[in-house]
Amino acid sequence: SIQSSYTFQACFTENGTVLIVDPGNGVAEINPSDGSLVRRYEEGIRVDFIGTAGKMLFTIQDQTLHGYDLDTGKPLDNISALTEQIQSDEQDVNWTTTSSFPLMFLKGDEDNSLFYIDHTGVYRYVLGGSTVEQIIDGSLNSLSSPDTGTVAWGQDSDGNFYVGCNAGEDIKIYSYVYSKDTPTTPDTELTVYSLKDNDFIKQAAVLFQKKYPDVYVNIETGMSGDDSVTDTDALKVLNTEIMAG
């Protein structure tokens, strides 16, 4: 049974069951035909997020990613490259809103593969693989815009992706079409320097990128805020790079 009287996230599985986040008590998998409990994941633990990709369940709790086989309920033991990649991005594992999802999963093009999307783009991963492949660069489109939040996404039979987003005060659906003839990164690069992280500059870069898709906008930030670099240090590095051409 569900311990709490409310939930902040639930989703259907390919098996026809329903996954419900039970606040403070993990995830409950329910048979909707009779309301019975199929199994429980991470019992007694606060889970911040759930997502499915085919027969796989993914959860985030305490900034760590966990994967499970929905057929057996057992943990996935061959996703180390995936967990390392996702956990390295604080925006993917720190949830600060319920109006959108910083991270979402999707069934892959093979039984043992999956796609996931975040603010940096769309990625493909094959279970057991040592690398995570980026197939859409978020810096070249609206995915990287600070005012864009993903709420849903899917893929059609031709392999095209459709992403529903909260974009400021609007709801938009973006489509991304893969073309083998389109370079992954434009040949022309424009570097924009910002002493500190700035959302206005990021939004401006996204708008420029959309208007001029043949130019890659590279934003460099002098001070990340995560280290002891001062503004003087950052400007010295910038001047050195400018003098070096």
PLM segments and residue spans:
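N-terminus-biased targeting/localization segments
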Residues: 1, 7-10, 20-22, 30-32
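Repeated polar recognition positions within modular binding domains
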Residues: 6, 23-25, 63
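Conserved N-terminal structural module of periplasmic/extracytoplasmic solute-binding proteins
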Residues: 10, 48-52, 58-63, 72, ...
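Extracytoplasmic/lumenal domain signature
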Residues: 30-36, 70-73
